[in-house]
Amino acid sequence: MDTVCIAVVGAGVIGLSTAACISQLVPGCTVTVISDRFTPDTTSNVAAGMLIPHTCADTPVPTQKRWFRETFEHLSEIAKSAEAADAGVHLVSGWQIFRSVPAEEVPFWADVVLGFRKMTEAELKRFPQYVFGQAFTTLKCETSAYLPWLERRIKGSGGLLLTRRIEDLWELQPSFDIVVNCSGLGSRRLVGDPMISPVRGQVLQARAPWVKHFIRDGGGLTYVYPGMSYVTLGGTRQKGDWNRSPDAELSREIFSRCCTLEPSLHRAYDIKEKVGLRPSRPGVRLQKEILVRGQQTLPVVHNYGHGSGGISVHWGSALEATRLVMECIHTLRTPASLSKL
């Protein structure tokens, strides 16, 4: 076998980062990203893009930490390069605050972010309803810039982007030797996974250029995340809700909650409503599988189900998916071991 043809299904941050990793690290292959929706119309485009991990119950914490560290290191390199503005990656400092002292005062990711420490009493005075807080510097990844940047990287490596709705992974055989499934919620239909479901997130994007520090309620529902062009105000976490239309009443509630944390937001302007459906699953599905139909076989690498935490671990999980793709290629080139895939 000479050139290996690889299809990546899905063009959110998981799909594009996986395609970019494969293009960068796997010699002798062609990569085609296939999706019915590309930026700016993906769920990832609604994401605030803050690197603060969301614990995934069925994914081992050491694995989550490794993915987060690899992602943080990857974006840190971009943030200190000439590419930072084009990629939409920058450092941001702020506070995560709690109404009661959390069971885990020092989270598993504390030594990955920069300058993690307990907030001082003077800092907490700014938030009178809160009794405990954490201060740190992390990274923000503006998906409106980062996704197009990843697309350019993929095309620059000879990859292709194809707008097409896939109804069945077998459609891609025999044109492609390996399929990487990064279809997020689409995996419910595409591979019949009943464990993946939507968690609806509604946010506001507002102009408030004077807001420089992030503020996040420890419960994760209310947050103020300043970015390069706008501040993201959140949010909601509505399990099983497929509605992509903004709810005006929810928007008012979100704005009110965020103004309680940062009263200067009352002066925010050019406010837009955004809705995304997070691909939630008890644990990320990152594994290889060989589909069999009659005498035909199709190697598949699954990489989906990151829920609210996709941005925070995208590069780490893309690296792991790439390692699995390499294993599939090795197997394809040694047919006698196909049954061991």
Swiss-Prot record:
Enzyme Commission number(s): 1.4.3.1
Keywords, sorted A to Z: Cytoplasm, FAD, Flavoprotein, Oxidoreductase, Peroxisome
Tissue expression profile of the protein: Expressed in the small intestine (at protein level). Expressed in the ependymal cell layer of the telencephalic ventricles, hippocampus, thalamus, cerebellum, midbrain region, pons, olfactory bulbs, and cortex. Repressed in the testis.
Pfam family, one: DAO
Main location (coarse class): other
UniProt pH dependence: Optimum pH is 8.3-11.
Regulation (activators, inhibitors): Inhibited by the benzodiazepine olanzapine; chronic systemic administration of the benzodiazepine increases levels of D-aspartate and L-glutamate in the prefrontal cortex. Efficiently inhibited by 5-aminonicotinic acid (5-AN) and 1,4-Dihydropyrido[2,3-b]pyrazine-2,3-dione (DPPD). Inhibited by aminooxyacetic acid, thiolactomycin, anthranilic acid, malonate, meso-tartrate and L-tartrate. Benzoate has no effect on activity.
GO-annotated cellular components: cytosol; peroxisomal matrix
Coiled-coil regions listed in the entry: none
Mutation effect (residue 308 to G/A): Increases catalytic activity and FAD binding
Thermal response of activity: Optimum temperature is 45 degrees Celsius.
Cofactors demanded by this protein: FAD
Effect upon mutating residue 237 to E/A/Y: Decreases catalytic activity
Biological process per Gene Ontology, one example term: D-amino acid catabolic process
Cellular location(s): Peroxisome matrix; Cytoplasm, Cytosol
Entry keyword DNA damage: no
Residue numbers binding FAD: 36-37, 43-44, 50, 307, 311-312
Outcome following mutation: residue 216 to A/E/M: Abolishes catalytic activity
Family annotation (InterPro entries): D-amino_acid_oxidase_CS, DAO, FAD-dep_OxRdtase
Reported consequences of knocking out the gene: Knockout mice exhibit deficits in sensorimotor gating, motor coordination, a decline in fast glutamatergic transmission and a decay of hippocampal long-term potentiation; the effect on sensorimotor gating is enhanced following administration of the psychoactive drug phencyclidine (PCP). They also exhibit dysfunctional melanocortin-dependent behaviors, including diminished autogrooming, diminished sexual behavior, a failure to ejaculate, and an increase in body-weight. Knockout animals exhibit a reduced occurrence of psychotomimetic behaviors following administration of phencyclidine.
GO MF annotation terms: D-aspartate oxidase activity; D-glutamate oxidase activity; FAD binding
Expression triggers: Expression is not affected by chronic treatment with olanzapine or haloperidol.
Similarity field: Belongs to the DAMOX/DASOX family.
Function (record text): Selectively catalyzes the oxidative deamination of acidic amino acids. Suppresses the level of D-aspartate in the brain, an amino acid that can act as an agonist for glutamate receptors. Protects the organism from the toxicity of D-amino acids. May also function in the intestine.
UniProt name for this protein: D-aspartate oxidase
Upper taxonomic lineage: Eukaryota, Metazoa, Chordata, Craniata, Vertebrata
Gene behind the chain: Ddo
